[in-house]
Amino acid sequence: MGRGANQFWEQAPATAIRTFAERRILDIITRAHQEVPFYRWFYAAHSLNPARLRTWADAQREVPSVTKADLVAFDGGQLLAGLSLPGIRQVHLTSGTSGMGREVYPRDSHDLAALGTGGAYSYLWAGLGGGDRLLLTIPYSQTMAGPYFQASCETAHVVPVNGFALDSAGRLEALRVYRCAGLSATPSHLHRLTAMARGMGLHPATDLPWLRTIVLSGEPYGIAWGHDMQEFWGAQLHEGWGATQTLGVALATCPVGALVGAGKSVTRGTLHGLDHRTFIEVLRPDGAEAGPGERGELVITTLRASAMPCIRFRMGDDIRRDPRSRCACGMTFSRYEAGSIRRLDNMIKIRGMNVWPEAVDDAVLESATVTDYRAAVYTDGEGREQVALKVETAAHQPPPQLELALQRRVKAAVGITPLVQIVPPGTFTDAAVAADGPFKARRWTVNRAVTGDQPS
Amino acid sequence: MNSDSARTRLIGEVSRLAWSAQRCQALASDETIDAPIVTNMLARINAQIDELRDELGPQ
C-alpha cells in the first residue's frame, strides 16, 4: 500500500479483527461494571448482569446504549468526582455548549499512552511524518484537543506548529515560515484561509511548495468545494474523525485521500475505522445495523480507553457506510464515506466550536425584553464564519446597550460572539419551532460555503 | 527472515522489555531509593509498553 502505519492491523483479516474486538468488548463491559462508577450505576439501573454475557450477540441484545444525557445525569453536580479516583492524570471535558452540561472524562496513564495513536494513523496515512511540520488551528481549552494533537504529532513524528492563538493572517504566515507540510483545520476555517489567501494574491501551489496535505475534521463538506481546495492549495485533502468520547481519532482517510477520481468523476473517498481501537456500530433508526451505502447513527465502544471507557455510546452523528465493495488502498478496516458525517440533533459547528441553538435560546431569551430572535450562520465576503442574530424586543425603545449585553451573554454561553441587530416588535410572524416531528429549531438558518452538495 | 518470524521475535523482545520495566518499577518503589520522579517515569514507560503491545497485536 505504501504510507502505512501498522501493517499487522491494516492487513489482518476483517474477521480476525472482529473476533479480537468482540472478545475485548466483553472484558471491558465486565471491568467497567466493577471499576467505573458510571457503569456501576448505569448497569444497575438497567438490571444488567455482565457475567451473563458470553458473546457479542449477547452484548448487543442486552447492553444498553449510553447517551450524553445519561452521562450528564450521573455527573450532575459532581464534576470533580472522577478526579478523586486513583491513578487519574488528566481530566477532559466536552465543550459544554450543548446547554445540557459537560461530560467528564478522567484519564489515567494508560489513556495518556494511547492518546496519540489514532491521530498518528491519520497523519501517517496522510503522508506526514519524519519531522514534517503540521499547522494546528483547532481551538481547545479543558477539552481533550490540546493533549490529543500534541500526542498524535509525537507518535507520528510530526512537529506541531501551534497556530491556535494566531489570527488567519498569522496562520498563513506560519505555513510559510515553518515550511509546513500539513495543515489541520475545519472545512469552514480552510474556506476562510482560502478567501484570505486569494485576497492577498497568494498561490499556495507555488508559494507554499512544501504544503502537501490538509487534514479536515469537525464538519461535512461538499465534493466540488473539496476539489476546488485541492486545486488551489496544491495539497491532498484528508479527514480524521474522533471525539473526546473516542480518545482521539477513530476514523481516518487512507493514503487515497478524502476525494477520489479526477475532473467531473471526483467522488468522496473512504474513512477507515480503526477497528482494533474502537468498535463501530452504525444503527438505523429501527435499531438494525446499516448495510453498505446506508446511513445510521454512529455508536462507538472504545477498546483502549482505561479510566472512562465509552461502551455503546450514541454519538449523535449520522454516518454513511461506504457503498463500494472495497477501497483501492486494500486495507481490511471497516469503511465509511468521507466528508458526509453530520449531526442528528441541532448541533452546528461554528468556527470549530460545537454550538447547540438551545444554548443560544437560553442566553438570548433570558432577557425579559427579548421576545424572539432569528439566527443566520453564513460565510462572509472574507470567508469568515459569522453568526448574525436579529433580535425582536417587546418595546420599540429597547434598553441601551442591549446588543452588547446579548453579545457578551452568547459569547459566555457558546464561545462565539455574534453580530446583533435589534428589530421592532412584530417582525417575526412565523413559528419558531416545528409543530410536529423531531424537534428542530427554525430560528436558525445555515448557509455556509463548504457544505453545498450534501447527499441525502 | 520473513515478516511473521520477525514479528514473533519482536513480540518476544517486547515481552522481555515489559517484564524488565515492571521489575524496574517495583524496585524503584523501594522507599530507600526515595525518587518519586523515577517511579513516575517508570509508570509512564509501563503504560506506553502496554499500548505498544496492544498495537503489536496478539501473537
Q: What feature does the model see in each segment?
A:
Chain A
Residues 183, 304-414, 439:
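AMP-binding/adenylate-forming catalytic core of the ANL superfamily
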Residues 209, 273-277, 343:
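Short, solvent-exposed loop/turn segments at the edges of secondary structure
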Residues 160, 237, 280, 373-375, ...:
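Generic structural signal for residues in well-ordered beta-strands
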Residues 2, 6-7, 66-233, 238, ...:
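Active-site phosphate/ATP/adenylate-binding loop shared across adenylate-forming ligases
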Residues 221-326:
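Conserved AMP-binding/adenylate-forming
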Residues 1-93, 99-114, 125, 286, ...:
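Nucleotide 5′-phosphate-binding alpha/beta core
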Residues 133-136, 299, 390:
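Short, well-ordered beta-strand segments
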